[in-house]
Structures are given as structure tokens and as C-alpha cells.
């Protein structure tokens, strides 16, 4: 793979507004469909954004999927209510729009297709004919905006209860509980809600049995320790064999994207921590980088290294929990307690630096909240001396265990084709042999300056391979942390920029103009230029991204949060059919997900 996506690296002005007409895919599209078939939008997303006609959507998608270096992954799909957007110069008239974000692994490039829709004709054809993982994304788009998906195999609510009324991400839908009538749960309403949760196999195209025997339908969750959160999965069983299954999500949904429309650019940062609550600062990274692209902020080198250091600490913390709970799911209890001892050392270090443990909300627009405290280097050095030997003991005592290997090798296995079709990222994708780590191929926050390797599997992603890759990723994160310790730059911890929020405190004590700016930015919030920006990062569980739309206000017009766990849970039925219930437990443990990352 050639790392040629330089518009997303630090060497290029990643926040510059570009139409990407020089991208080869624009020429390929125009050669095939004509020079006037599309409207190309200039954005700060770092990728080509092309408006296509609804009638051409499937044809264009099929063309991109069959190019010599094809766009093989549907990374994201969602919508936007355009009715109140004022800065739309040069764009097709639209009350609503739907976007399709595609990735070409061979090109290391993306493209975003957009379709403009009228309020009186809200419909698009289903993309599931080209990409099976469009299924859940289209269900959520219909649920949140009321955009009909023609030909969809099962267009029902996915995040909200089946009895919910309205489409929450429309601009005329209330964003606060105080704008609704007081909630009442009558006996009749409770019975209605319980009835709505009843699983009817016929609704999902499932048979209740064959001519000779009946199938059994088993509810696993939403309150089950092996479900790793408020997650329900309905199993169609023939004895112990899983004939089919239906994942049921949404129990942890909190409306994170709607919150983004009611919080200032600055005050939304704490909400990012809670998208994937184990990831801490890793979650803050894509959001603040996307906002900095809107603002045109380039942060000092010290900020970049500090952000990388905190991200890798949280990556190790999350991976330790994942590995130990996976071992516990297979049947061994002791490693969990050992892992929590190691995680406590990380929490002590994170708390010393940020003041918090799990949800630090410490990154800022243009920098970090404050400089590193005295003694941070001693704590980090002690941890780096401690952790490598512990990893060796985990691997020797538990992960090389023949029982664990027998329970996990060859279980829930899939190849590169299946991984790409379902939008799998992170270790699940790399286990299939595809070397794709955003830190390497689309470096951000100075990752291009670090020396580390990307662990890759041998061609098949099974439960055991996924776990062992995470172990090696831990070692590489320790390697990155050692470089942070040895090469921490001197300099400021905030950028000298008018939109840095809050601005450097020292100046507020000397200049009344800076004090006024400080007051406005932490109360109303900074005003970001009207534009669109996008940032993806290699998070703890796969690729996490923020796609932000500013309409020149103190708040985001649209905040789209793409999480890896959402895509990974959609893949469950295709990977587990024909396996046993005991295999499902091992598979769920190997995915590495938390439900807040799924449900947002």
C-alpha cells in the first residue's frame, strides 16, 4: 500500500478548503458519466465530496466498487436536515441530504457521495445491494430523519423503541426533555412497550421450524454478563447450533449527535469521552482535530506529542480490559484481577496529568487543558519498566493455554472480503491480512514522527488471532510511549490562535480584549467558520470519526459520530451462523465493543 493521502497528514494544510478536482476518481467519474453529471463541493474534510442525482446513485456506487483500485468499503452512511442551513452557496437545492462515505484500501483514499432530497419526496434506493453493511445505517437514517429507503429488507427502528414517534435528528424535533410533556408510564403504556419487545420470527423472515422439528428462540440479554453491556441478541437455535440471529441494539442510546447541536464547540468535549467510555482521550482526538480544521488551527509540537501520549495510555488501558475479559469469557478468572492492577497504574498516571481517571475531557480546541505536571516523566518511566514483563506473563500463562486456543481458534472466522463488506476496522480487519492502521497510513497529531509497527494477521480473522493482535498492539503502544518520554518537545500547550478555547490564561490578566474573548468563548462558545470537516482516528476498537458541519455559529449544525462497534455488531449473524452458543460467547468477547460506542 502506498501512503499517498497526504491531504490528511501534518505535512499538508489539512484544514485548507479544497474541492479535490485533482483526485483521480473525479476524472474517472467524469469520463464515465460526463463532465456535468455532478456537483463537486469544496470542504475541509480532506476528501472529494460529490453530489450525485438520486437516479444515478446505485450506478455511481457500482462503478466505484468495480474500478481497477476499487472503493471496497462503505465506511459511513447517514443524513442531514438542510432546511435551516444558511451557508449553501453553489450546492444543489435540498431540504434533506444523504451521504455515502466510501474507502479504497488500495488507493488509500476516500470519496463522499451526497444526494439532495426534497421534503415532499424523501426517498433513496437501498445501498444494501452493493454493500450489505448499509442495512443498519439506512435503518438509522430512516429513523432519525424519516427518509424512506426503497427496497430495504427490514426498515424498522434501530436506536429508539418501536413505539417511538417522530424523527429525532430533524431540526423541528425538540432537543431538550423540558420541551416535551411530562413523562407518564401508565399500565396500558407499559403493556404496550412490553408487547413491542416481543420477538416475532416472521417479521425477520425466520421460520419457526421445519417439517420435522421446531426451532427454539433464545433471548441473550439485554442483561447478561457475556453480552458486555445492554445488548440483546435473539438466537434461532436447532439444538445448540445457531441457525440465525438478530442483534437488538439501542438500549444505551443517549442522543449524542443531537446533543452536538445544542452544545457549543467547546462544551461538547466532555460528551465525546462518553461515546466509548473506556477510550478517554482517544475519543476526544477526532473531535478536536475536526474542530481545529474548521478553525484553521495548527497546534504546537508539544501538544501533538502530549495528545499521542494520552491516547496510547488509554489504548493500553482499554486493551488490557479487553484481553482479560476475553480470557474470563472462555473460563479463566485470575487474569482479570491481574489486569486491573496494571490498569490502576495507568489511571494513577492519567489522573496525575489530567485530574480525572476515565473521562478526563482534557483536550481543548487548539491544545490541552494545562501543561504536564512535575513528575509525569517519573510515573511514565515506572510504568514502562513494569508493563512489558506483565504482558509476557499474560501471554505465557493464559493466552498460550491449550484450552483457550481450542475454544477460540477457527471460531467466528472471516476473510478480508467479508471484513470489508461489513465495514470492519481495527484488529478485526488487520487480522485478515489487510495492513490498514490510520496512525500509519493517514497520520494525525504527529504519528508520522513515531517509529512503530502495525501487527497484521495471516489472512483469516478468528477469535484467537484478534486477541493476539491486540497483545502485540499493546507492545507497540509501549514503544510509542517510550518515544514520548524520550522526545517530549518544549513549548506552549496551546496554539496562539484567536479560536483557541479557552485562550492562553496569561494574556487574560493583561489584555481586556483577550479577557472578553475568554468570557465569550467559555459562555456562548467560539464561532467557527461555515464549512464541513472530517477526522478519523485509530481508536481502541477500530476507526472512529467525526464529520462536522458548521453554519457559522457557536454550535455545530450537524455532528455525525461514526463508531467502529456499530459496524462490528452488525456483522455478528454472518460470522456466527452454524456455530454453537458457546462459540457465540467467545466471539462476543473477541469483538471488543462497549454499547455506548454502538448506541451513542
Curated annotation (Swiss-Prot):
Q: Which HAMAP family match?
A: NDH1_NuoCD_1 (MF_01359), NDH1_NuoD (MF_01358)
What's the protein name?
NADH-quinone oxidoreductase subunit C/D
Which family is this sequence assigned to? In the N-terminal section; belongs to the complex I 30 kDa subunit family.
Q: Which domain of life is it from?
A: Bacteria
Cellular component aspect of the GO annotation: NADH dehydrogenase complex; plasma membrane
Enzyme class per UniProt = translocase
Which GO terms fall under molecular function for this chain's record?
NAD binding; NADH dehydrogenase (ubiquinone) activity; NADH:ubiquinone reductase (non-electrogenic) activity; quinone binding
**Subcellular location(s) of the protein:** Cell inner membrane
Q: Does the keyword Membrane apply?
A: yes
**Gene this protein is translated from:** nuoC
The record's keywords, sorted A to Z, are: Cell inner membrane, Cell membrane, Membrane, Multifunctional enzyme, NAD, Quinone, Translocase, Transport, Ubiquinone
Q: What is this protein's function per UniProt?
A: NDH-1 shuttles electrons from NADH, via FMN and iron-sulfur (Fe-S) centers, to quinones in the respiratory chain. The immediate electron acceptor for the enzyme in this species is believed to be ubiquinone. Couples the redox reaction to proton translocation (for every two electrons transferred, four hydrogen ions are translocated across the cytoplasmic membrane), and thus conserves the redox energy in a proton gradient.
**Gene3D superfamilies given in the database record:** Cytochrome-c3 Hydrogenase, chain B, NADH:ubiquinone oxidoreductase, 30kDa subunit
EC number of the protein: 7.1.1.-
Q: What is its main location?
A: membrane
Q: Which stretches of sequence are listed as region NADH dehydrogenase I subunit D?
A: 214-600
- Lipid bilayer topology: Peripheral membrane protein
Chain spans, region NADH dehydrogenase I subunit C = 1-190
Q: How does it assemble?
A: NDH-1 is composed of 13 different subunits. Subunits NuoB, CD, E, F, and G constitute the peripheral sector of the complex.
One of the Pfam families matching this protein, by short name? Complex1_49kDa
Q: Signal sequence span per UniProt?
A: none
Reactions mediated catalytically: a quinone + NADH + 5 H(+)(in) = a quinol + NAD(+) + 4 H(+)(out)
